[in-house]
């Protein structure tokens, strides 16, 4: 496995390609690469183009309200940000939540994982691999044999695919679709035959309904989506075993049965459509093993899907770190230790007193400093090319013990596999065996997993794990309620008079995109300081003062592009991370002037 290059070693002499904005993501992102005479990427620059100021807004506010602000960081992985904020306050105040609340939070969290893995694959990254225009050439009868061979799925008749093809033809011919004017549909990077393309379009449409239905679990337990309700001390939904006082709402029994139906529907789709589709893409593009970068070297997970409340050793996906490419050693992670988690700003549009030193989030500073390097091409309001030797992003550089890390499903799965989690090992071994059998290859874990395709497979496998374990949580919740426990919140420390004068806490979770942490300091009942490090700030990190490069930039290196002006290869790899730039950055004006003033009561 090749060594991880330092920024000082990257070749910037070739042609510069700018992708701005990177589309089919959440938020605003810019990417610049240099390509050599053979169209190989030799340098990559990933930029967050908006400033996030919610940490500043939270200062001086009631910590019980923090979740209502920070969940607005993002409308996609909506519940996980709120949950992590609530956990930080509970940690600071020493609050233990009831078992029912633990199970309900787990169900809501895993539901988000399921939906937020299905949507990126089918609706954000699938068009990097699938040519919908080519699907018009497919024979519906021949296509119907494909899903039958892959898995048992009800919607696989010739008539079904003929109907989808007719809809697609009208859509393309209408001229109102990006399929015709904005796609790179004649790019030789697209290698799939017409039949898999038609099957993919059909499943694209099915996934729209699946993701819409599964998210209704949030509305049952959290009242709405996006931005479902939680509360410090538990969850905001009461257990009501009859209709008395339900104000026209469902009883708990009716609601729980509804939740179970959604779980089974998502499970069927994941096993019979999603996983086979991912393996089908991998089989067609079996030689496209670009997009590795940090997974072969540095990986981080905070751990998630805790079975026993308060016991991180019971995580289905454990916490841990891998550094230096040593997959044989999973290191422990402690997010409270100042030397472990640090933020740097030497290449970010922020100001520190000493920009050669990193700050732990409990001591974090969010002070903007928008300035461009001397080799920037263009103006402050119309940048043509960035000068990455200086400040170039609104994302801070994050490091674990001095290492840039990749986070997300692939990191979680490699760490879980190397930690001996049997469910994960069976999934990975089964999938790799199926890939090798269908392609005639004999790739090992370290050859396949650290790649764009491996990252995409890990997301699908985690979706399967999440939806399977939701059944366990549902059964445990029903059993606990039947045993007479109806508690969903611990309000013993709701009154600020019960709080210490000063306290600090941290809430951690694994969002769909990776490690998520919120660090909070309290003083006199108010928030003194608040810092959030979200997954895209790990993966989208700019370079630090030592030249360490982040996951996005590292993953793009050494990729060969068919046509640099049609950057489908860049999109494939970036979309495999499912970037969420709104989580990592928010808003900026060209010259720092006030854009608007909002009074928040």
Curated annotation (Swiss-Prot):
Its EC number is 1.12.99.6. Its cofactor is Ni(2+). Binds 1 nickel ion per subunit. Keywords: Cell membrane, Membrane, Metal-binding, Nickel, Oxidoreductase. Its main location: membrane. Disulfide bonds: none annotated. Ni(2+) binds at residues 74, 77, 580, 583. One of its GO terms (cellular component) is plasma membrane. Belongs to the [NiFe]/[NiFeSe] hydrogenase large subunit family. This is Uptake hydrogenase large subunit.
